[in-house]
């Protein structure tokens, strides 16, 4: 393979000149040895981003570029970055290059590796079957159900509970469905990745999970590509093993953010709000590979950070276009102590159709939303005039809506250590029955505080008994 020389270094972006007949292809991985202070050298991987002409390529570094100088030799590997795939990746933690970072020894040489850049599956191989994925989380299963093999976005600003919701979904789906999961940590806090790893080790879920991390402290190159590394591992389980896989990406906004960090250095003109002009293309290249084929499915659950709670920002707006279901987390609900803080009126799913979930489920979900919407409209009147000025019918609607609002909250298994309360998993069937009973007024005599942070109606009745209410 060809050998080039470093001609320019601009932070994470490095220009390399090759001989004319040895010019590497776009997306090829290049390697160079970087001297360290202790006299040793460390290998650094670069990825070719564009050709500048005059036999110079512009590359993005996957690690720190400290210690590199002009004139250093750079080798072309002749292929894109590739990561290990298959059963040997389960229970392990990797970086963007597929190197293990969990101190549990190297991956055997015999393990196959796949390039992280690939084409999406052709149209004639895609599956069109629609099937609901039960999560055990009431608000999700009732109002914005997830589709097996679909894409789900968890939208929310900073600190509203996206990562906790993802951790609960990993836990519930692994425990109840026993599926294989791949977790890609893209530009999030290292502490959260650490916590997640130890939680999953304690619960035994880690044995069925591969984890790939490119965290906040890493250069933009690693954060840009780590989602593709995780997706490549998931694709192998789908295409070769014929399995149903869950792909968790936390956070897809950081993927876009990393692209915008290097975009200007690559010489591209910024577009709206300073994002890269290739925003929609980059998002599409990732999202189009996440799909169900005749062989197996990839169901992806992606946390989407919303900068300054502004949903019109180009990054979350571009992600919206690719999703089958959205779970919107609302700061107002966290202030009321309702967790998960999912907004029942803003969250959507294309699966909430009578032909998919059944007529009863559909009717109950729509009645729940109508009751909550009516309550929202009456809140201004209540704030100005008080409850006494409402008609009897409106009073009854408000009281039921408050019970519904509290009953949409529940304790999570992954939050047990913080709350001291046991987590709960509620089946879709039970969820629909319980909400139907609340709407019909069966539980109007039970105080609304009994509905807070519970699982099924049995827990509410138990709580009411403890309060001294006649059940």
From Swiss-Prot:
GO CC terms: plasma membrane; proton-transporting ATP synthase complex
Binding-site residues for ATP, renumbered to this chain: 156-163
Membrane topology: Peripheral membrane protein
Top-rank taxon: Bacteria
Subcellular location: Cell membrane
Catalysis: reaction(s): ATP + H2O + 4 H(+)(in) = ADP + phosphate + 5 H(+)(out)
Keywords attached to this entry: ATP synthesis, ATP-binding, Cell membrane, CF(1), Hydrogen ion transport, Ion transport, Membrane, Nucleotide-binding, Translocase, Transport
Pfam family, one: ATP-synt_VA_C
UniProt cross-references to PROSITE patterns, sorted A to Z: ATPASE_ALPHA_BETA
EC number: 7.1.2.2
Cited CDD domains: ATP-synt_F1_beta_C, ATP-synt_F1_beta_N, F1-ATPase_beta_CD
GO MF annotation terms: ATP binding; ATP hydrolysis activity; proton-transporting ATP synthase activity, rotational mechanism
PANTHER family: ATP SYNTHASE (PTHR15184), ATP SYNTHASE SUBUNIT BETA, MITOCHONDRIAL (PTHR15184:SF71)
Protein family (similarity comment): Belongs to the ATPase alpha/beta chains family.
Subunit text: F-type ATPases have 2 components, CF(1) - the catalytic core - and CF(0) - the membrane proton channel. CF(1) has five subunits: alpha(3), beta(3), gamma(1), delta(1), epsilon(1). CF(0) has three main subunits: a(1), b(2) and c(9-12). The alpha and beta chains form an alternating ring which encloses part of the gamma chain. CF(1) is attached to CF(0) by a central stalk formed by the gamma and epsilon chains, while a peripheral stalk is formed by the delta and b chains.
Protein role: Produces ATP from ADP in the presence of a proton gradient across the membrane. The catalytic sites are hosted primarily by the beta subunits.
HAMAP family reported for this sequence: ATP_synth_beta_bact (MF_01347)
Protein name: ATP synthase subunit beta
Native source species: Staphylococcus carnosus (strain TM300)
């Amino acid at each position: 393979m060809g050998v080039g020389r470093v001609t320019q270094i601009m932070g994470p972006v490095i220009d390399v000149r090759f001989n004319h007949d040895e010019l590497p292809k776009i997306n090829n991985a290049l390697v160079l040895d970087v001297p360290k202070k202790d006299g040793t050298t460390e290998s650094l991987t670069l990825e070719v981003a564009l050709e500048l002409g005059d036999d110079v390529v512009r590359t993005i570094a996957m690690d720190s570029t400290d210690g590199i100088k002009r004139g250093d030799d750079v080798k072309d590997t002749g292929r894109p970055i590739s990561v290990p795939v298959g059963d040997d990746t389960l229970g392990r933690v990797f970086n963007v290059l597929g190197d293990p970072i969990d101190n549990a020894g190297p991956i055997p040489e015999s393990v196959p590796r796949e390039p992280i850049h690939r084409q999406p599956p052709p149209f004639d191989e895609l599956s069109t079957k629609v099937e609901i994925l039960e999560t055990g989380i009431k608000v999700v299963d009732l109002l914005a159900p997830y589709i097996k093999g679909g894409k789900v976005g968890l939208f929310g600003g900073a600190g509203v509970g996206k990562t906790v919701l993802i951790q609960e979904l990993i836990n519930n789906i692994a425990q109840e469905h026993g599926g294989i999961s791949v977790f890609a940590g893209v530009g999030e806090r290292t502490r959260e990745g650490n916590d997640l790893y130890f939680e999953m080790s304690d619960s035994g879920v880690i044995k069925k999970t591969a984890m790939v991390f490119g965290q906040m402290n890493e250069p933009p190159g690693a954060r840009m590509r780590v989602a593709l590394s995780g997706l490549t591992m998931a694709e192998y389980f789908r295409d070769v093993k014929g399995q149903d896989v869950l792909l968790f990406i936390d956070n897809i906004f950081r993927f876009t953010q990393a692209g915008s960090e290097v975009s200007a250095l690559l010489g591209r003109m910024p577009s709206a709000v300073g994002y890269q002009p290739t925003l929609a293309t980059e998002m599409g290249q990732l999202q189009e590979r996440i799909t169900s084929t005749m062989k197996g499915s990839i169901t992806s659950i992606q946390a989407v950070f919303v900068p300054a709670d502004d949903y019109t920002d180009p990054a979350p707006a571009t992600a919206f276009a690719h999703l089958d279901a959205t779970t919107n987390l609302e700061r107002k609900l966290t202030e009321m102590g309702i967790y998960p803080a999912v907004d029942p009126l803003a969250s959507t799913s294309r699966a909430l159709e009578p032909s998919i979930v059944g007529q009863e489920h559909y009717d109950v979900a729509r009645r729940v939303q109508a009751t909550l919407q009516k309550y929202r409209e009456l809140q201004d009147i209540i704030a100005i005039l008080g409850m006494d000025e409402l008609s009897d019918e409106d009073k009854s609607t408000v009281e039921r809506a408050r019970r519904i609002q509290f009953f949409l909250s529940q304790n999570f298994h992954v939050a047990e250590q913080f709350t001291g309360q046991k987590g709960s998993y509620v089946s879709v069937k039970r969820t629909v029955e319980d909400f139907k009973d609340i709407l019909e007024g069966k539980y109007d005599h039970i105080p609304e505080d009994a509905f807070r942070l519970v699982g099924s109606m049995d827990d509410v009745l138990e709580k009411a008994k403890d309060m001294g209410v006649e059940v």
